[in-house]
Amino acid sequence: MKRLTLLPIFALLAAQSAWPQVASKANENYKTKDGRDGVAKTLDNPNRDKSQKPEEIIAAMDIQPGMTVADIGTGTGYMLPFLSRAVGARGKVFGEDIQNDFLDRARAKISDDKLSNAQIYLGTETDPRLPAGSVDIELVLDVYHHFDYPDKMLANLSRALKPGGHLVIVDFYKKDRADHIRLEREDVVKEIEGNGFRVTSQRDKVGNNQYMVTFAKR
């Protein structure tokens, strides 16, 4: 009888260890150095400002001087100069990514642009490894669909937020990039709400024909 009782437990543990990475297709180009170099060229395209409209996103985030803002999945650090200016000398900017070769480029950008209020954090697929209770606003720009383990990542993003802090998701509509985007906007909202957040505001169009949803912890 004891052996029979234990079988469901072993089955559950096996299922958990084999839990699928939900963003494997979106992350295909990130698995090799050559692939990441190709992505980096896109991220650092000198014409990107015209399509991404970073200043529009910054304005919609309602960043105040002195805040601490985290750029989750910063990549090569494209948004860091814009965020650095927005928070000012008394503020802080955390640039987080899970790829060290991307972060090498972000570090160079911080040095070249003299972003004295910017810091780099190397995270993992499940944890940005930011200090607990340290961040006023977390920006997830074109990155949520890359989260392989969204539940775990959201739990750790929540842990890093200050009381009253906000999580800002900016991403593409699935209908526009069906081969790359995992969820429709409404399903993204449901997934994040299911992990202890509530919606505080939404915009149908910002940046590069993207949506923006701002969340606070429940």
Regions found by a protein language model. Give the residues of each.
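A short glycine-rich, Lys/Arg-flanked "PGG" loop and its adjoining helix->strand segment in the class I
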Residues: 84, 151-166
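Short glycine-dipeptide loop
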Residues: 65-66, 89-90, 161-167
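Class I SAM-dependent methyltransferase SAM/SAH-binding core
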Residues: 70-128
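A short acidic, Gly/Pro-enriched loop at the edge of an enzyme's catalytic core
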Residues: 128-138
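Class I SAM-dependent transferase core
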Residues: 21-70
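Core SAM-dependent methyltransferase catalytic element
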Residues: 189, 201-218
